[in-house]
Amino acid sequence: MANLRKTHPLLKIANDALVDLPAPSNISAWWNFGSLLGLCLGAQLVTGIFLAMHYTADIATAFSSVAHICRDVNFGWLIRNMHANGASFFFICIYLHVGRGLYYGSYLYKETWNIGVVLLLLVMMTAFVGYVLPWGQMSFWGATVITNLLSAVPYVGNTLVQWIWGGFSVDNATLTRFFAFHFLLPFIIAAVTVLHLLFLHETGSNNPAGLNSDADKIPFHPYFSYKDLLGFAIMLLALTSLALFTPNYLGDPDNFTPANPLVTPPHIKPEWYFLFAYAILRSIPNKLGGVLALLASILVLMLVPFLHTSKQRSLTFRPISQFIFWALVANVLILTWIGGMPVEHPYIIIGQIASLLYFSIFLVLFPMAGWLENKLLALNCSSSSALERRSCKPDAGG
């Protein structure tokens, strides 16, 4: 009798995705982040639904309802802290996952990559509307500043802003709709994640060497299912440690003050995971230019597959591109630091240089480095012996 997991219509789908999935034998811990993101999404959905049972989306009671959750609901303080800090871990995993994709050339699976960029935008949107819900000072002013950016859209800008606000300022209607969006979007993210996996399983996973691994595949279970469990344990340990010992470490003190439209906080800034994009937005003096740069900072990822010039897929054997990649990582960290700083000298000029370098790396330096490495490879091959020349025809990976 055939195994039920291989014949049952529903179990067969799960089996092909999680049990008998052929995976390259050499994928490293950097390939853990996909499953960690699935764990993050699941944890955020569960904690979020429990919070929604006690939260009230009304400007008169929203702030009090969050305080009520932390004080009066059984383990409400834990659920709230796990949800707030879970968002930070979600973004840590996303940025590491994207970084892995850039380093190892996973972006050459164009459909999977582009759906991943859409997922990143959806998660950023969800986190933004979620940050507004506690209705503290930074929630209110963050919502005001970011939604106001839409007024830069020519001709329809002001109408668009008032349409999103549901009035002439950020008010009750805004909070109600943001709660509706924050509840709905994670389910859309879950659906798009299924698409992301569907396209990934059409091609199979990439690997650190960037080579076709069809000749050397092993089943996902038990090898990588157990390997992923170690990642789960490490992440959950880190998340619970943060949520239990320093739950407000990554938050903003201004958000412990109820929203007041008459008092502007001295420095309006988003959560730490948006600071790099916020720094790019602020580095351009023109409002419309800033909004376009903000969008471009994420959408530039969609251009990466088309700007791949190297004959090799991953950066494993490409030292020049490796240097540029780590320069990009350092640059994003500098932008994150600048995003949290006031708009004054020398932070303005540092932010502008870092923003210019950010786009230069993606649009100019990476393609040039790939082209240069091809030339160096050809030069090396032309001076090699006939036997060595046989291995001088690299493929961009399978």
From Swiss-Prot:
Heme b b562 binds at residues 83, 182. Coiled coil: none annotated. Heme b b566 binds at residues 97, 196. PROSITE patterns: CYTB_CTER, CYTB_NTER. CDD domains: cytochrome_b_C, Cytochrome_b_N. It is found in: Mitochondrion inner membrane. Pfam families: Cytochrom_B_C, Cytochrome_B. GO terms for biological process: mitochondrial electron transport, ubiquinol to cytochrome c. The keyword Transmembrane applies. Keywords: Electron transport, Heme, Iron, Membrane, Metal-binding, Mitochondrion, Mitochondrion inner membrane, Respiratory chain, Transmembrane, Transmembrane helix, Transport, Ubiquinone. Component of the ubiquinol-cytochrome c reductase complex (complex III or cytochrome b-c1 complex) that is part of the mitochondrial respiratory chain. The b-c1 complex mediates electron transfer from ubiquinol to cytochrome c. Contributes to the generation of a proton gradient across the mitochondrial membrane that is then used for ATP synthesis. This is Cytochrome b.
